[in-house]
């Protein structure tokens, strides 16, 4: 008899068929309490859980006593209570490698769009404001040869450093929990403390997961240390930044502009002051959102769950100690 799983994400037919070859699959729209109650027996017997974006917490786990593995279609897992899974010997799988290059493309796009004011001037053209040769009021700033500061030198940080160093001749500074010798050797990146990075960088790019240590790592003090000409990019997690402090820094001219893919609350409120600022490029968490990469993420998550329920957790496992 096949193990049973809960699937709370719509998958392409070929990936669904791959799952069905190994498991009895119950598809649900979400993990809300009313959904769990409606499918109580399926949740109670499920050994696997696959999906994205929904909260996986102790309350849910209490309804899933047979659960052995959860697979998230994402690299981040701040919506999952990992400690609760580990305590129940449930492994958590994620997709850390397949989205690296695509997210780095997004960060580079935010840097370019923000510096060159692409969104702002495109909207002005559409509004019929281009009635004569443009002047300084339409100008942006250069990207090439500017100093890039990367906060979080993981896979995505490395891919961004590669683009910046080789493509735009940008000196690269970085701050991370530990020095990254490959970044220093390949891109001549310079490790420095956060304060030094903030003071010297023309672009400050944040690519950090959300943890207790990184929550509101960027606040009024950090923005005050940045150059008034600096551009701030956040493509990690929204709550790493105190959004009110960012808004104040932009309003007060403490920094030049911001390119944001993530926010403290998502979707971003239509009342957010960020939406009324011409020096802000705000996009709806599109870091990995290409057809190719999202398919590859789903395929990776499917394979991760198949492997995990066969006892294979050599790669992409967040908490391998849970299998001990």
Swiss-Prot record:
EC number(s)? 1.1.1.79, 1.1.1.81
Is-annotated flag, keyword Oxidoreductase? yes
> Where the protein is mainly located, per its record?
cytoplasm
Q: Can you tell me which residues form the catalytic site?
A: 237, 266, 285
Family membership noted in the UniProt record: Belongs to the D-isomer specific 2-hydroxyacid dehydrogenase family. GhrB subfamily.
Q: Which PANTHER family match?
A: 2-HYDROXYACID DEHYDROGENASE-RELATED, GLYOXYLATE_HYDROXYPYRUVATE REDUCTASE B
Q: Which HAMAP family match?
A: 2_Hacid_dh_C_GhrB (MF_01667)
UniProt cross-references to Pfam families, sorted A to Z: 2-Hacid_dh (PF00389), 2-Hacid_dh_C (PF02826)
**Which GO molecular function terms does the record list?**
glyoxylate reductase (NADPH) activity; hydroxypyruvate reductase (NADH) activity; hydroxypyruvate reductase (NADPH) activity; NAD binding
Source species of the chain: Salmonella paratyphi C (strain RKS4594)
Q: Which reaction does it catalyse?
A: glycolate + NADP(+) = glyoxylate + NADPH + H(+); (R)-glycerate + NAD(+) = 3-hydroxypyruvate + NADH + H(+); (R)-glycerate + NADP(+) = 3-hydroxypyruvate + NADPH + H(+)
Q: What does this protein do?
A: Catalyzes the NADPH-dependent reduction of glyoxylate and hydroxypyruvate into glycolate and glycerate, respectively.
Q: What class of enzyme is it?
A: oxidoreductase
Task: Tell me the subunit arrangement.
Answer: Homodimer.
Q: Which PROSITE patterns match?
A: D_2_HYDROXYACID_DH_2 (PS00670), D_2_HYDROXYACID_DH_3 (PS00671)
Q: Which UniProt keywords apply?
A: Cytoplasm, NAD, NADP, Oxidoreductase
Q: Which GO terms describe its cellular component?
A: cytosol; plasma membrane
Q: What is this protein called?
A: Glyoxylate/hydroxypyruvate reductase B
The entry's localization annotation reads:
Cytoplasm
Q: Does the keyword NADP apply?
A: yes
